[in-house]
UniProtKB/Swiss-Prot annotation:
This is Shutoff protein. Residues 726-742 have a biased composition (Gly residues). It comes from Human adenovirus C serotype 2 (HAdV-2). All late proteins expressed from the major late promoter are produced by alternative splicing and alternative polyadenylation of the same gene giving rise to non-overlapping ORFs. A leader sequence is present in the N-terminus of all these mRNAs and is recognized by the viral shutoff protein to provide expression although conventional translation via ribosome scanning from the cap has been shut off in the host cell. Changing Y682F: Almost complete inhibition of ribosome shunting. The gene is L4. It is found in: Host cytoplasm.
Length: 805
């Protein structure tokens, strides 16, 4: 019954249907429908043997035939197996390819555990070792020619949307505290108060002696919304959240306050490195208490928990023994260490003109603004896809940099202000993380020595700001400041900031998908309305607002044509603006249109040349910066000034104006020559209009009927007079008689004989000058305007080379 089994198999080949077999007499006379017909030589006449027993069947079949049948059956089974492998699962060829995924992941885990002496048993230890091997390897990744690091295939096995803990060494820490009632969300006029105009200066820091009283209430100027009061009275219970519905709330805040009820928020940690702060507190304020050991002597007296400076010593330094004066000095020192020195370090880091320039340049990449947008357009390369972290450059094409363009008005300003605020928090946290990781025990001991040497100067300083400035000189030296400023900020995208925003909101117990909250909504906008622990966030919010206006990101001032990438900030206007810098515009128009070849030093080597390519021009354009016209600490747009720029406006590569003018004239003459002599239809690359349209064929001139009849009468009279006078006719009609060479057979004057072709078969056209055109008659155009019937196989731009005529 071998044939029946083969028929039931869907993957078995059909060769058995055309092959004769010795047991065909015992098989039923059925064939598959798909089997081809047998040829005449292979047709077997089957006979019905009737009922036979197994013994008779065995005796009737020879032994050699049985062996042949077994061999055929085994061959057919092997063939069926090969057919199943060919037509079935294609993954089982050789080794199972599905095991490669596990093999690769096991190899990565083995590499991660090689540095450990024992194999960790906890999942957290394995995960930590795995993340350190992926994101913090001992050997840094190789750098490619374009500046980015090579792709790491090991990252394919890490969860895509998970935040690795080993990277977020400082970003995962938060300062959980109560939201002040005077936060920005409870100030309906916050957008007007934060608006900056021409002449606004960079914000400054504050101290507790300058702001002695702090108001955290709602204020008299704010009025609750009427529907919020009705809802509170109807429910007969007080509002348990901090956010209050106000009359002047915008649509976003109104929806937010009805969506959530919060009292606390997780503010990103902005503290100085814990190692530094622990050392400063122990040497200046109070001695640090260490955990007790088993063998420690409890009767032994130590300085742990005691003030770093006793009352007797402080009284000798201050030359007073009044308890109130001593207590006031201790409060001043505590405020300077916990609050003001942090603000002092922030201001030194962010307010530096060079650092501010780098911050604004990074914001131009983040928001695809101004000169960065112009460079992307000319180079045809999306430069905003570049992101970096700790000096390593990556190309990420999944990031978004144009999300802010979908917003208008106050919604756009709130979003941009929040993005810049998060960008500053992110940058400061990155700097603090690097600072924390670089410190070792010997550095902390050296810091203790410096603090002990300057202990008296710190406690006897003039005021809180002077104490903070002196302390910042010790713990935040100039070398450390310059090193961090050179490596930061990192290039970020709006997608990265959005992930950071969601990370903060989730840690605060706010679901981002159900509300439209921004982290900056919970930060007060003034120092006198903000608790001192949040003064760092208040300063960063004010600085973010200033940078957003100084970079001209708050409003969209772009337009059409040359104004497509226009930006009013000092980084773009006037030196990088195609609108204000005419030489830069001329240089951008001749990109790729010429190549200057210099004299070769010898006959063998090629001569050095200059070819203005888009890449060369873009590189020089991005590097172009004029510090004389950059006003870091004041909003001073070039458009709002009546004075000329301090530096001369020049191009990027070709800075000599006369050379640039010659190249521009050559390019213009070449384009005009192509329009006149070239073949094809030339299109404007910007508008798409034809630069050399084919004029319509001229229409024959038709005189009015009255003039035509009058002209015909005059011609008939002239012909009769010519026939009367004979050869020569009237004066001035020489050689146009009936018998002259110009006369026709009909005797009419001025009609040359058409059958005769002399040396002037085609006569010149005569143009009458000074004649007043008749009404309705077409004007005669300029003779220098030639008409060409141009044929084109495709649309060509002004920069392409047409076919030679």
């Amino acid at each position: 019954m071998e044939s029946v089994e083969k028929e039931d198999s869907l993957t078995a080949p059909f060769e058995f249907a055309t092959t004769a077999s010795t047991d065909a007499a015992n098989a039923p006379t059925t064939f598959p429908v798909e089997a081809p017909p047998l040829e005449e030589e292979e047709v077997i006449i089957e006979q019905d043997p009737g009922f036979v027993s197994e013994d008779d069947e065995d005796r009737s079949v020879p032994t050699e035939d049985k062996k042949q049948d077994q061999d055929d059956a085994e061959a057919n089974e092997e063939q069926v197996g090969r057919g199943d492998q060919r037509h079935g699962d294609y993954l089982d060829v050789g080794d199972d390819v599905l095991l490669k995924h596990l093999q690769r992941q096991c190899a990565i885990i083995c590499d991660a555990l090689q540095e450990r002496s024992d194999v960790p048993l906890a999942i957290a230890d394995v995960s930590l070792a795995y993340e350190r091997h992926l994101f913090s390897p001992r050997v840094p990744p190789k750098r490619q020619e374009n500046g980015t690091c090579e792709p790491n295939p090991r990252l394919n096995f890490y969860p895509v949307f998970a935040v690795p803990e080993v990277l977020a060494t400082y970003h995962i820490f938060f300062q959980n505290c109560k939201i002040p009632l005077s936060c920005r969300a409870n100030r309906s006029r916050a957008d007007k108060q934060l608006a900056l105009r021409q002449g606004a200066v960079i914000p400054d820091i504050a101290s507790l002696d300058e702001v002695p009283k702090i108001f955290e209430g709602l204020g008299r100027d704010e009025k609750r919304a009427a529907n919020a009061l009705q809802q509170e009275n109807s429910e007969n219970e007080s509002h348990c959240g901090v956010l209050v519905e106000l009359e002047g709330d915008n649509a976003r805040l109104a929806v937010l306050k009805r969506s959530i009820e919060v009292t606390h928020f997780a503010y990103p940690a902005l503290n100085l490195p814990p190692k530094v702060m622990s050392t400063v507190m122990s040497e200046l304020i109070v001695r640090r208490a260490r955990p007790l050991e088993r063998d420690a002597n409890l009767q032994e007296q130590t300085e742990e928990g005691l003030p770093a400076v006793g009352d007797e010593q402080l009284a000798r330094w201050l030359e007073t023994r009044e308890p109130a004066d001593l207590e006031e000095r201790r409060k001043l020192m505590m405020a300077a260490v916990l609050v003001t020195v942090e603000l002092e370090c922030m201001q030194r880091f962010f307010a530096d003109p060079e650092m501010q320039r780098k911050l604004e340049e990074t914001l131009h990449y983040t928001f695809r603004q101004g000169y960065v947008r112009q460079a992307c357009k000319i180079s045809n390369v999306e430069l905003c896809n570049l992101v970096s972290y700790l000096g390593i450059l990556h190309e990420n094409r999944l990031g978004q940099n144009v999300l802010h363009s979908t917003l208008k008005g106050e919604a756009r300003r709130d979003y941009v202000r929040d993005c810049v605020y998060l960008f500053l928090c992110y940058t400061w946290q990155t700097a603090m993380g690097v600072w924390q990781q670089c410190l070792e025990e010997r550095n902390l001991k050296e810091l203790q020595k410096l603090l002990k040497q300057n202990l008296k100067d710190l406690w006897t300083a003039f005021n809180e700001r002077s104490v903070a400035a002196h302390l910042a000189d010790i713990i935040f030296p100039e070398r450390l400041l310059k090193t961090l400023q050179q490596g930061l900020p990192d290039f970020t995208s709006q997608s990265m900031l959005q992930n950071f925003r969601n990370f903060i909101l989730e840690r605060s117990g706010i679901l981002p998908a159900t509300c439209c909250a921004l982290p900056s909504d919970f930060v007060p906008i003034k120092y006198r309305e903000c608790p001192p622990p949040l003064w760092g966030h208040c300063y960063l919010l004010q600085l973010a607002n200033y940078l957003a206006y100084h970079s001209d990101i708050m409003e969209d001032v772009s337009g059409d044509g040359l104004l497509e990438c226009h930006c009013r900030c000092n980084l773009c206007t006037p030196h990088r603006s195609l609108v204000c810098n005419s030489q830069l515009l001329s240089e951008s128009q001749i990109i790729g249109t010429f190549e200057l070849q210099g004299p070769s030093p010898d006959e063998k080597s090629a001569a050095p040349g200059l070819k203005l390519t888009p890449g060369l021009w873009t590189s020089a354009y991005l590097r172009k910066f004029v510090p004389e016209d950059y006003h870091a600490h004041e909003i001073r747009f070039y458009e709002d000034q009546s004075r000329p720029p301090n530096a001369e406006l020049t191009a990027c590569v070709i800075t000599q104006g006369h050379i640039l003018g010659q190249l521009q004239a050559i390019n213009k003459a070449r384009q005009e020559f192509l329009l006149r002599k070239g073949r094809g239809v030339y299109l404007d690359p910007q508008s798409g209009e034809e630069l050399n349209p084919i004029p319509p064929p001229p229409q024959p001139y038709q005189q009015p009927r009255a003039l035509a009849s009058q002209d015909g009468t005059q011609k008939e009279a002239a012909a009769a007079a010519a026939a009367t006078h004979g050869r020569g006719g009237i004066l001035g009609q020489s050689g146009r008689g009936g018998f002259g060479r110009g006369g026709g057979d009909d005797g009419r004057l001025g009609q040359p004989r058409r059958s005769f072709r002399g040396r002037r078969g085609v006569r010149r056209n005569t143009v009458t000058l000074g004649r007043i055109p008749l009404a309705g008659a077409p004007e005669i155009g300029n003779r220098s305007q030639h008409r060409y019937n141009l044929r084109s196989s495709g649309a060509a731009g002004t920069a392409c080379s047409p076919t030679q005529p």
